[in-house]
Every structure is written in C-alpha cells, then in structure tokens.
C-alpha cells in the first residue's frame, strides 16, 4: 500500500487536483465555509471526481498538525518526482538549470525555493538527504503547488553528486559573501547549477571546494546577507534574464 501524506491549504490541494487527482484519497473542508473561494474549490473537486467531507474546524486542525490549512485538507498518496540525476539531464532540451541547496532544513525556506524554482524553469532541486527537510505539509503549502511540478532529489553524498554533474558538463556556481566575482559575471546561458548554503552557515567546506566558481550577490545596503529563498530567486532570475536576453 502506498504511503500517504497530508496536503493543507487551497494552493497545495488544488495543485494536486490539477496534476494528479487520482492520488487524492479524501478531501476534508470546513463545514461552516460557504464563500466563493470554497465554492470554486468544491466544483474543482467534483469535476475531478474526488469525495469531499465537510467537517468541523477542529478536525481540520488535527489533520493539518499545525500547518495553516485555510479550511481545506486532503489525504493523498505520496507522489515522488525524484529520479536520478542522469534521468533528469537526459530529457532536458537545451542548457540545464538546477538548484542545489546545502543544509536548508526550514520547510518555509524549502517551499519558497521550490516555488521560485518552478517559476524560473528549474529542471530539478537537489539537496543532501541528511541535511534537508522532506516534502511535508508546510513545504507543500508554501510551495503553492511547485512540490508537484519540480523534481526534488535528495542524495546521500552531495559532493559526489556535484562531481557527477561536472562530468555531465554542468557548471557549478556557489554563492559566497566573500567571493571576488559578482553573480552578474556568471555565464548563466550554459548548463549550470546555482549552489546555495543555509542562512547563517553557508555552504559546507567540501561543497564550496567542489564548485567551479564562487560569486557574491551585490549588497548595497546595511544588511550583510539575504534569506536563502530570496538569494535563490535573485540568482535564478539572473539565469532567466541571460537566457531570454
């Protein structure tokens, strides 16, 4: 029997209804909500042939386990987009764009990174298995559906995976506040991966040493660094800018 996961909030549940409705086993909604947004959602669920159970808000709180649910919770089969690195690269047409997260364990940060990755056309997000958060309900909610569209690969040895990417001609660019080069000096039109460390800690030594290039994000004000999800967005959209220019 496939293991299940809880999806909380309109964005997460609607995204699953759109991409894999058959994976949803049950949907629970707050019985007292009769607003337009809820009505639209109920119509979507009906079109997808999914059963909906009106329940008390307290029941939803218990199912969501602390995740803000907006009156909507679904129980669904776990849906993994995780495949091997080679499988990801083999089907890409044109230059690859990857995001590597080293030590990002906060679910809000991961969810925001996945959402940005989807918007920027990232082919996969990669993280070390022992230093990463799983695709829990909070990640699913913050990602606004991107957890169902962007492959999230957790690997046992990040440095080894990075070396495998280099063998496939993927240029690895790490962000470092002390780097001499600016992110704007990166040739982001080639197959590449942006490598991000955890906020406060940065990349681990071996991760940093495995990068082909280290760059800094220009900081013109008084703050010294950006949140990892914001830094990821800045760098990924530099790739988008160059590739569309």
Swiss-Prot record:
Pfam families per UniProt: SpoU_methylase, SpoU_sub_bind
Keyword Zinc: no
UniProt main location, coarse: cytoplasm
EC number, UniProt record: 2.1.1.185
Reactions catalysed: guanosine(2251) in 23S rRNA + S-adenosyl-L-methionine = 2'-O-methylguanosine(2251) in 23S rRNA + S-adenosyl-L-homocysteine + H(+)
Keywords of the record: Cytoplasm, Methyltransferase, rRNA processing, S-adenosyl-L-methionine, Transferase
GO MF annotation list: RNA binding; rRNA (guanosine-2'-O-)-methyltransferase activity
GO cellular component: cytosol
Entry function: Specifically methylates the ribose of guanosine 2251 in 23S rRNA.
Family per record: Belongs to the class IV-like SAM-binding methyltransferase superfamily. RNA methyltransferase TrmH family. RlmB subfamily.
Name the record gives this protein: 23S rRNA (guanosine-2'-O-)-methyltransferase RlmB
Naturally occurring in which organism (per UniProt): Bordetella pertussis (strain Tohama I / ATCC BAA-589 / NCTC 13251)
Protein's gene: rlmB
């Amino acid at each position: 029997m496939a293991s299940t996961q809880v999806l909380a909030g309109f964005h997460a549940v609607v995204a699953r209804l759109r991409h894999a409705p058959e994976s949803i086993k049950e949907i629970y909604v707050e019985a007292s909500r009769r607003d337009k947004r809820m009505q639209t959602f109920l119509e979507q669920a009906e079109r997808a042939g999914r059963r909906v159970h009106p329940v008390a808000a307290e029941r939803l709180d218990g199912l969501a386990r602390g995740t803000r649910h907006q009156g909507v919770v679904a129980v669904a089969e776990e849906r993994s987009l995780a495949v091997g690195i080679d499988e990801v690269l083999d089907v890409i047409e044109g230059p690859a764009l990857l995001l590597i997260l080293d030590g990002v364990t906060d679910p809000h940060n991961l969810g925001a990174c996945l959402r940005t990755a989807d918007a920027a056309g990232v082919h996969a997000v990669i993280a070390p298995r022992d230093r990463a958060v799983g695709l829990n309900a909070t990640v699913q909610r913050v990602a606004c559906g991107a957890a169902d569209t962007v492959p999230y690969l957790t690997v046992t040895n990040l440095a080894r995976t990075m070396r495998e990417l280099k063998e496939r001609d993927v240029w690895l660019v790490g962000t470092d506040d002390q780097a001499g080069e600016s992110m704007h000096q990166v040739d982001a039109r080639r197959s590449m991966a942006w490598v991000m460390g955890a906020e406060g800690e940065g990349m681990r030594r071996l991760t940093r040493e495995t990068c082909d290039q280290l760059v800094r994000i220009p900081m013109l004000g008084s703050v010294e660094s950006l949140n990892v999800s914001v830094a990821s967005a800045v760098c990924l959209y530099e790739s988008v800018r160059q590739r569309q220019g």
